[in-house]
């Protein structure tokens, strides 16, 4: 990946990493899936509806980039629904796509301490929709939290007052500046934006990153990425019933059971690849690249994005990883599916390390976008253009982390260093796939193409 530049942090990212990994399923759903490696010799390949090529997937429903207009940040697709009540969402508030009503309700509940005053007459099991949200405040607040709204994102009255004062001071400085209104020179990433998460004060850092604000363009970018991920995840949920069931028979070592496990993980990998491609097409700037570069970037980054999403689904209490809605796997399950211990252990170690960082949806989305736009990937025709497209995401992540964790100056470089770790894992993945080839295992055409598995 090319080395992104910032004005304050000089953290080297991976240089010319290993050549594009060969293949091996890495599946995902809500995130990616694992990747079978040293699989059982007698397990046949799984060829099916997954025979689409990368080019075909890129061509499918390809949408031109939307023109951006000045003014309030528009919704990315126009049909997002509130994750609390199902009404039309107005934006990304307090870490969740939600409507204005639920945004205001959550803010008032936190500021006024509503959690202790609300009571449900139905035993706390009300199904929340646009009608019931007015009937049961307790269940509405519960649904807000279940959807992911965070109390720490809500600004207190005192914080709002200080924020208004700072904004007024900035406006006065801009008006008195000889260069006129513009971006403050005190911070390379500052600008007339809002704290992470929305202009309503729904930012992760409660606006405490002194001197740093997200620009309006950065705020819109983050909203677009998070909304795109949510939409792609939901699409993949619909494929869950089509996946070959995990064998639960009496003899887990039978040939049929091994075949089913291999097919199961391979099909999850295909869902993951399709989801990643769908997401990449919605990342601002990706479709501006030539077709050759789009394919080169996807081939090289897919396994790394799968591993990022795998870490995102890691549960430290159960030490399991969940894909799609409710497919949960332990280390033993990964091994039974055909992966080698040499690949399984690093996956779980990486997942634990990512959990310690505590990334939110916006940070994961930005990190994935940075990973996609890696100019040093093999066969990239216009590396300078790719690097230029990557830089705004690096700048946005830097500003976002400064606002969210202003006291943790090492958070941003730690996140970038995880991309270096992904290059190492990608190399281990290549060895995993080589084991498959030695055993004459054939992957479905899509996985063979995305990871350059040559017969």
Curated annotation (Swiss-Prot):
> What PROSITE patterns does UniProt report for this protein, alphabetically?
NR_LBD (PS51843), NUCLEAR_REC_DBD_1 (PS00031), NUCLEAR_REC_DBD_2 (PS51030)
Q: Where is the composition biased (Low complexity)?
A: 14-26, 168-193
- For bias type Polar residues, the affected ranges are 1-10
Q: What is its main location?
A: nucleus
User: Where does the signal peptide begin and end?
Assistant: none
Q: Name the segments for region: Transactivation AF-2.
A: 214-455
Give a short account of what the protein does: Nuclear receptor that exhibits a ligand-dependent transcriptional activation activity. Binds preferentially to double-stranded oligonucleotide direct repeats having the consensus half-site sequence 5'-AGGTCA-3' and 4-nt spacing (DR-4). Regulates cholesterol uptake through MYLIP-dependent ubiquitination of LDLR, VLDLR and LRP8; DLDLR and LRP8. Interplays functionally with RORA for the regulation of genes involved in liver metabolism. Induces LPCAT3-dependent phospholipid remodeling in endoplasmic reticulum (ER) membranes of hepatocytes, driving SREBF1 processing and lipogenesis.
Relate the assembly described in the record.
Forms a heterodimer with RXR. Interacts with CCAR2 (via N-terminus) in a ligand-independent manner. Interacts (when sumoylated) with GPS2; interaction with GPS2 onto hepatic acute phase protein promoters prevents N-Cor corepressor complex dissociation. Interacts with ABCA12 and ABCA1; this interaction is required for ABCA1 localization to the cell surface and is necessary for its normal activity and stability.
Protein name, per record: Oxysterols receptor LXR-beta
